Each structure stands twice: as structure tokens, then as C-alpha cells.
Amino acid sequence: LDIQNAGGGIQSTTNATRQASEQELAAKASKALDEMMGFGTTTVEAKSGYGLATEHELKALEVIKDLNDHHRMDLVATFMGAHLVPAEYKSNREEYVRLVCEEMMPKVKEQGIAKFCDVFCEADTFTVEESRQVLEAGLKYGLRPKIHADEIEAIGGSQLAGELGAISAEHLIVCPPAGIEAMAKGGVIACLLPATSFNLGAVFAPARDMVNAGVPVAMATDFNPGSCPCLNMQFV
């Protein structure tokens, strides 16, 4: 979070994504998909979330759609305009949440370029109430909810996932017992990302507690430019 607040991390990747053309993004992604396929992966969930502006979020989702059409890998797209409040909206968070819900989502729905909606519910990103607003708007536009929750601080993201019946909650490194209980009741899949914990030197999510509580557990790479360079599910 310190790196992010200093303009690095997600914001740095956002700046690079905005400057890149669709062709440049597709070439970079295609190379990563080739490597994933070499490790035996045949289906990938790909998220937007590094555009953080309508034009660039749609650009990323269009690239995912084109790759699904032309690459051997099967891709499933997730809209994640609520990954971070971008620098230009730091003093007007409410307007950015409105932009995500009232401008981006209708266009995503109209173009049919995403199946899921995700939000990063965490300290210094989106509050529980902001996350609720985003995910409920996603449901309105036919986007099934997912949530990044309890990665650094347990602020209530896993409980929100259970309340909304999200398809999955990601990270969950510091997921509390109340969050596990809520996910079990809501039928939420805990999508754990241990390669990120490994890369950051962080603790691992309480997977055994989740299994014992009846929460279905899945794992993924969390391949991204900032916190996890891993493309290999065999390592995960």
C-alpha cells in the first residue's frame, strides 16, 4: 500500500496501460498465454482493472475478447474498473464510483465483453459500502459478483461476499472466522492465491479452516505486474 500510495503499484501499471495500444496489449498478453499453455493451462480468467477510465477499461476487455476469439486459450473476462480510485479522482471518490457503476458498466453490458464484476475491497482502495454499490450495480447489468477481500486487512469484504452470494472471493489471506462463516452460508468459493503470498513473503490464507467450515476452495496464479509474476499453476 505504501508503494501504491506513492504512485507505484496499480497506478503505475495503469499509466502504462493507458499509453499502450490494443495491439501492444494483445501482443504482451498473447506471450503470457503461450507460456501458461506450456504449463498445461487451457482456461484463464482475465480481468481489466488497469485502465481505470471508461475508454481504457473497455480497451482491455476488447483485447480479452479478441484473444479469446483468436488464441488457443479459452479466456473468461472480468470487469474490474473498481480496482483502485485513480489519481485524478482521489479528491472525489464518489464520482469515480458513480463512473464505474453508471458509465462503465452499461457499456460493458451493451458490448457483452465481460461475465463477472470484481472489486478490490481493502483499506485505501474501496470500502465495504463502495464495494457493495459496485457489485449490486454489476448484478443490475448481469455481471456476477466477485471480490478481492481480506488481502491486507479484514475490513468486511469476505462477509460482503457471503451476503451478496458472490461467485468467489479472492486472496482472503487475513480472512476472519466471521468471514469464513459468511462465505459458507453464501455458497462463496474461496479462490486462494498462494503464489502472491510466496512472492510477497506474506502468510497464507487459512485454507484448512475454510475447508472444515464447508467453503469450497479453488486456487489461481494471480499473475499480475505488481505482486505476482507466477504463470505456472503447477507451482501454485
Residue ranges of model-derived segments:
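Structural detector of well-ordered beta-strand residues that form the stable sheet scaffold
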Residues: 76-78, 146-148, 170, 189-191, ...
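His/Asp/Glu-enriched, well-ordered alpha-helical/loop segment
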Residues: 138-145, 162-164, 192-195, 201-236
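Metal-coordinating catalytic core of metallo-dependent amide/deamination hydrolases
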Residues: 8-30, 34, 42-155
